[in-house]
Swiss-Prot record:
Biased composition (Polar residues): 22-42
Subcellular location: Cytoplasm
Effect upon mutating residue 124 to A/V: Abolishes glutaredoxin activity
Protein encoded by which gene: URE2
Protein name: Transcriptional regulator URE2
Residue ranges of every copy of the GST N-terminal domain listed in the record: 112-196
Taxonomic classification: Eukaryota, Fungi, Dikarya, Ascomycota, Saccharomycotina
Positions of post-translational N-acetylmethionine modification: 2
Miscellaneous note of the record: [URE3] is the prion form of URE2. [URE3] is the result of a conformational change of the cellular URE2 protein that becomes self-propagating and infectious. This conformational change generates a form of URE2 that assembles into amyloid fibrils. [URE3]-aggregates sequester soluble URE2, which then fails to retain GLN3 in the cytoplasm, resulting in GLN3 activation and consequently derepression of genes that are required for utilization of poor nirogen sources. [URE3] can be cured by GdnHCl and by deletion of the molecular chaperone HSP104, which is required for [URE3] propagation. Present with 7060 molecules/cell in log phase SD medium.
Organism: Saccharomyces cerevisiae (strain ATCC 204508 / S288c)
Length: 354
């Protein structure tokens, strides 16, 4: 772990930029085969022009093709990271930095709605944006510039003492600050439930709430960190450590195996419940369950509806192919589940940074 606040999330953000998480795709709503939305709009034109090449280089890394291009890409990434480290060092003395944009915001912040502090390449920030959009809450997003050290601004550190994104200000609760993505999601659904009486993306049943919490904590503690570490050791660590790449990639696969099994069980229960005329044949194994007209119906981790337990996975599922995992082939239930969520208007809006 890095000692300086924000260095790890900064490196991951640059990592995601350099492996083509940077360009919004206007055709994402109609693409049925590729569920990858592009997060960042803040990359330069050179990165945009080379995005297709960079993406192909990453996908072909395991097969050994395009070796020289892969090496060039990795060298470019290392150079970018070195520049980033130098910038971080230059801004380490906070007395020499004027955070005018952040200071101005805190002097003129709105009185209603929410303010989300995020980064254009931070999956956890988009996780919060998705839930805000799904709940219909009015919010503004400030995408911090880590290269300028905005996450170290004293005003922002007062919102999140860990100096990382996401962080949220609830202006309707006397400018309450919430940090850590899981805590933010729980705050939002509980507030919506209290205000409307509708447990949207949540539940009014204590048992279901406990299960939602379990999956949410599993995502924040096991799913996201493992993908982040796999990305780091695959592309950005100063030394090539094959065992580290293998260890974290295998752990990501293990995590997806847990989710795949849970969704498959939900799928089987749904098909057996709805397709009663063929249930006996499915049970006997004489007819594959995949032939059921209900086989592509959406299933969710908890109960029979979409919750924050499901949505929390979306932005990270969206980048997992960068570590060589094809969820469409390896984890088909996870793929279908993610695809259903990625088609939702609120999810599309949030992932586009709108």
């Amino acid at each position: 772990m890095m000692n300086n606040n924000g260095n790890q999330v900064s490196n991951l953000s640059n990592a995601l930029r350099q492996v083509n998480i940077g360009n919004r795709n206007s055709n994402t709503t109609t693409d049925q085969s590729n569920i990858n939305f592009e997060f960042s709009t803040g990359v330069n034109n050179n990165n945009n022009n080379n995005s297709s090449s960079n993406n192909n280089n990453v996908q072909n890394n395991n097969s050994g093709r395009n070796g020289s291009q892969n090496n060039d890409n990795e060298n470019n990434i290392k150079n970018t990271l070195e520049q980033h480290r130098q910038q971080q060092q230059a801004f380490s003395d906070m007395s020499h930095v004027e955070y005018s944009r952040i200071t101005k915001f805190f002097q003129e912040q709105p009185l209603e709605g929410y303010t989300l502090f995020s980064h254009r390449s931070a999956p956890n920030g988009f996780k919060v944006a998705i839930v805000l959009s799904e709940l219909g809450f009015h919010y503004n997003t400030i995408f911090l510039d880590f290269n300028l050290g905005e996450h170290r601004a004293p005003e922002f550190v007062s919102v999140n003492p860990n100096a990382r994104v996401p962080a949220l200000i609830d202006h309707g609760m006397d400018n309450l600050s919430i940090w850590e993505s899981g805590a933010i999601l729980l705050h939002l659904v509980n507030k919506y439930y209290k205000e409307t009486g509708n447990p949207l993306l949540w539940s009014d049943d204590l048992a279901d709430q406990s299960q939602i919490n379990a999956w949410l904590f599993f995502q924040t503690s096991g799913h996201a960190p493992m993908i982040g570490q796999a990305l780091h050791f695959r592309y950005f660590h100063s030394q090539k450590i094959a065992s580290a790449v293998e260890r974290y990639t295998d752990e990501v696969r293990r995590v997806y195996g847990v989710v795949e099994m849970a969704l498959a069980e939900r799928r089987e229960a749904l098909v057996m419940e709805l397709d009663t005329e063929n249930a006996a044949a499915y049970s006997a194994g004489t007819t594959p369950m995949s032939q059921s007209r209900f086989f592509d119906y959406p299933v969710w981790l908890v109960g029979d509806k979409l919750t924050i337990a499901d949505l929390a996975f979306v932005p990270w599922n969206n980048v997992v192919d960068r570590i060589g995992i094809n969820i469409k082939i390896e984890f088909p239930e996870v793929y279908k589940w993610t695809k259903h969520m990625m088609r939702r208007p609120a999810v599309i809006k949030a992932l586009r940074g709108e």
